[in-house]
């Protein structure tokens, strides 16, 4: 096997501080130190390894982790779903153009509903009912997604029209 790096899921849970659902995303210096220690240990063994975090915490905390060389997920699901459905509200992609070059943007994931499915449920006019129109809109979405600078996470071909809900037959559709 050739391992390029490691992805850590739900890293806001990597803490020794007590927290609740509402406070887990607050700035936590101890969590930063734990993740920096893991990062250093990985780099000691393989200096070119990627370390990717599903973090979703305070922006100051994410900035510190990025400055240490780690990459962080950047959830753009809502914006891409809004454009896929033909809606302008909340459809800006500017979250991927922030000053932190360590963002790994994504349109969909195992935690987020698929854009093509949302088109069939809440799409504007023909986007809801016409497959050809939906696919053309998803092509435009993919064009924006793939041309934004930086790395991308692609998950189960949502950009190609996977229109089954993630809730069908359990969490993975």
What are these regions (language model features)?
Residues 10-112, 120-124, 133-136, 143-147, ...:
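Active-site-proximal helices and loops of the catalytic beta/alpha 8
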Residues 1-7:
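An active-site-proximal structural segment forming one wall of the substrate-binding cleft
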Residues 116:
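Active-site-adjacent loop/helix micro-motif of nuclease/hydrolase catalytic cores
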């Amino acid at each position: 096997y050739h391992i390029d790096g490691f992805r850590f899921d739900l890293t806001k849970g990597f803490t020794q501080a007590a927290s609740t659902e509402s406070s887990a995303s607050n700035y936590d210096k101890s969590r930063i130190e734990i993740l920096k220690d893991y990062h250093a240990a990985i780099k000691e063994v393989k200096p070119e390894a990627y370390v990717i975090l599903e973090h979703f915490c305070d922006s100051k905390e994410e900035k510190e982790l990025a400055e240490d060389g780690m990459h962080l997920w950047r959830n753009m699901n809502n914006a891409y779903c809004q454009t896929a459905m033909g809606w302008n509200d909340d459809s800006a992609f500017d979250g991927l153009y922030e000053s932190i070059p360590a963002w790994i943007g994504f349109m969909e994931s195992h935690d987020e509903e698929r854009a093509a499915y949302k088109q069939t449920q809440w799409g504007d006019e023909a986007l809801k009912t016409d497959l050809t129109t939906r696919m053309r809109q998803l092509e435009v979405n993919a064009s924006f997604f793939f041309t934004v600078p930086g790395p991308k996470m692609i998950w189960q071909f949502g950009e190609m029209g996977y229109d089954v809900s993630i809730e069908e037959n359990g969490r993975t559709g």
